[in-house]
């Protein structure tokens, strides 16, 4: 009999139901460096105290169940249980609280995002005592980070592979996203790449449909890449979407891409799943392929402010599972993204060490212990007038991706690509000369139109296009104080 069992045997077994807070609410607990820490936004049902709600989250996402069980005596709950160690009210909300929960590291399988999420965001999200529950942030301890390989290559290795430095990379999603034949699709890629873009991209729902089978698409896109490289003298790429119905088929597509000699492939990591994504990331690392990640389905999980998982958590999970790029919103385009929140998880994707900063929605200090960084991808409803803001917001280590903002150019794809490249080069040069992109951005673009007719035409087409809707996911503030200001 183990010492743990001997300790428990003397306590005896008392059947029945008891409040979670008696066991799992421990405000005196001092967190350990090896604990996984979670910040949950908890909305209890009427009549449920916040301490009980927080304790229920800790219990149901670790060792607890709805009643006392005799097998509790066969292990040490003090060693393995999750602990709610803090509760704080959410400013401006009547019945929402941030519950802080600490999990012992031994609860989780090494190198498995799948297992981590199965525990922390599993059945507890359907718990009846909670009206709503949202995972706002995680602190991943360095001991656990070191069990993950992370991105296949990372930012610096990608720049070295592409031989491109000192500016954001430029991309384009081929449109229409569905319906083109493989040959016409490849032609669209070629026109964009020869015009000055670094990458073109499969849309997230392009897999292997009757109108364009994956092998045909891969062949014609590879032809486009090599032809554009020969003409421009620059390394080019196309995000070949390897996402498939099975992991075996996904890896078969990745192998074919490697045999073609292309530099990068793509995966839809949420619809494809973390197990598939980690497997694909390992293959890319071993075979010299960059891996672009699309976040299709993320808004189902992260858009509601009081329920689900915040994207900063999904971004951390992707950095652990593996990917060299990930879509991160634009702040200025057609998709959801509040500026400070977006900058917060962009830092979490790129930097080695990120301090706690609630003004950016970061609840915990995170040390990635040299895990490679991920390039954020700004994509969705952006065009040349957005270039100064995008360059200022995202900086050099990013990918700026213009789909309609390239292919919608009145003169065609190649002139659309030229317009974007000229606008980017103008913004980077102006920034390097000390000009303020935030205040002088429109003037910088207008100056560049004087020597680029392609840019002038693009500016004329999109001069009235704006996406002015309030973000759903915003930082918490005291609403009463805001009204008085």
UniProtKB/Swiss-Prot annotation:
Its cofactor is Mg(2+). It is an enzyme of class 4 (lyase). InterPro entries: RuBisCO, RuBisCo_large_chain_AS, RuBisCO_lsu_C, RuBisCO_lsu_C_sf, RuBisCO_lsu_fd_N, RuBisCO_lsu_N_sf, RuBisCO_lsuI. The keyword Cell division does not apply. The keyword Metal-binding applies. The modification N6-carboxylysine is found at residue 201. Binds 1 Mg(2+) ion per subunit. Mg(2+) binds at residues 201, 203-204. PROSITE patterns: RUBISCO_LARGE. Its EC number is 4.1.1.39. Pfam families: RuBisCO_large, RuBisCO_large_N. The active site is at 175 (proton acceptor), 294 (proton acceptor). Its main location: plastid. Substrate binds at residues 123, 173, 177, 295, 327, 379. GO terms for molecular function: magnesium ion binding; monooxygenase activity; ribulose-bisphosphate carboxylase activity. Residues 1-2 form a propeptide. GO terms for cellular component: chloroplast. It is found in: Plastid, Chloroplast. Keywords: Acetylation, Calvin cycle, Carbon dioxide fixation, Chloroplast, Disulfide bond, Lyase, Magnesium, Metal-binding, Methylation, Monooxygenase, Oxidoreductase, Photorespiration, Photosynthesis, Plastid. The modification N-acetylproline is found at residue 3. The basic functional RuBisCO is composed of a large chain homodimer in a 'head-to-tail' conformation. In form I RuBisCO this homodimer is arranged in a barrel-like tetramer with the small subunits forming a tetrameric 'cap' on each end of the 'barrel'. Heterohexadecamer of 8 large chains and 8 small chains; disulfide-linked. The disulfide link is formed within the large subunit homodimers. Belongs to the RuBisCO large chain family. Type I subfamily. RuBisCO catalyzes two reactions: the carboxylation of D-ribulose 1,5-bisphosphate, the primary event in carbon dioxide fixation, as well as the oxidative fragmentation of the pentose substrate in the photorespiration process. Both reactions occur simultaneously and in competition at the same active site. This is Ribulose bisphosphate carboxylase large chain. It comes from Flaveria bidentis. The gene is rbcL.
């Amino acid at each position: 009999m183990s010492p743990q069992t001997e300790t428990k045997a003397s306590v005896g077994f008392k059947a029945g139901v008891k409040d979670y807070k008696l066991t799992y609410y421990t405000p005196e607990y001092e967190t350990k460096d090896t604990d996984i820490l979670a910040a949950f936004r908890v909305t209890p049902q009427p009549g449920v105290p916040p301490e009980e709600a927080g304790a229920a989250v800790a219990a149901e996402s670790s060792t607890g169940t709805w009643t006392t069980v005799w097998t509790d005596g066969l292990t040490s709950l003090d060693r393995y249980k999750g602990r709610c160690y803090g509760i704080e009210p959410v400013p401006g909300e009547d019945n929402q609280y941030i519950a802080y929960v600490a999990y012992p590291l031994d609860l989780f399988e090494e190198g498995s995002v799948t297992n981590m999420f199965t525990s922390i965001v599993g059945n507890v999200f359907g718990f009846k005592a909670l009206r709503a529950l949202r995972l706002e942030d995680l602190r991943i301890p360095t001991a656990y980070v070191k069990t993950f390989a992370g991105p296949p290559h990372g930012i610096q290795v990608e720049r070295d592979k592409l031989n491109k430095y000192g500016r954001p990379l430029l991309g384009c999603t081929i449109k229409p996203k569905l319906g083109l034949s493989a040959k016409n699709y490849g032609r669209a890629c070629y026109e964009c790449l020869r015009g000055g873009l670094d990458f073109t991209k499969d849309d997230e729902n392009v897999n292997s449909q009757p109108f364009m089978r994956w092998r045909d698409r891969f062949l014609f896109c590879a032809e486009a890449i090599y032809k554009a490289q020969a003409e421009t003298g620059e390394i080019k790429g196309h995000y070949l979407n390897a996402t498939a119905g099975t992991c075996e088929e996904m890896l078969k597509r990745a192998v074919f891409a490697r045999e073609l000699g292309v530099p990068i492939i793509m995966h839809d990591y949420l619809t494809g799943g973390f197990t598939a994504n980690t497997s694909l990331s390992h293959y890319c690392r071993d075979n010299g392929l960059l891996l672009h990640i699309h976040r299709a389905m993320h808004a189902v999980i992260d858009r509601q402010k009081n329920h689900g998982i915040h994207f900063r958590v999904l971004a951390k999970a992707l950095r652990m599972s593996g990917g060299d790029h990930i879509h991160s919103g634009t702040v200025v385009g057609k998709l959801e993204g509040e500026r400070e929140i977006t900058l917060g998880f962009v830092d979490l994707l790129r930097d080695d060490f990120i301090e706690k900063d609630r003004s950016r929605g970061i609840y915990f200090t995170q040390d990635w212990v040299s895990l490679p960084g991920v390039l954020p991808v700004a994509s969705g409803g952006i065009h040349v007038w957005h270039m100064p803001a995008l360059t200022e917001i995202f900086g050099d280590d990013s990918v700026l991706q213009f789909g309609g903002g390239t292919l919608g150019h009145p003169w065609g794809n190649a002139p659309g690509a030229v317009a974007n490249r000229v606008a980017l080069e103008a913004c980077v040069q102006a920034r390097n000369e000390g000009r303020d992109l935030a205040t002088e951005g429109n003037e910088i673009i207008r100056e560049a139109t004087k020597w680029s007719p392609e840019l002038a035409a693009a500016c004329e087409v999109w001069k009235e296009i704006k996406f002015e809707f309030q973000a759903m996911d915003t930082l918490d503030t005291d609403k009463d104080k805001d009204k008085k200001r």
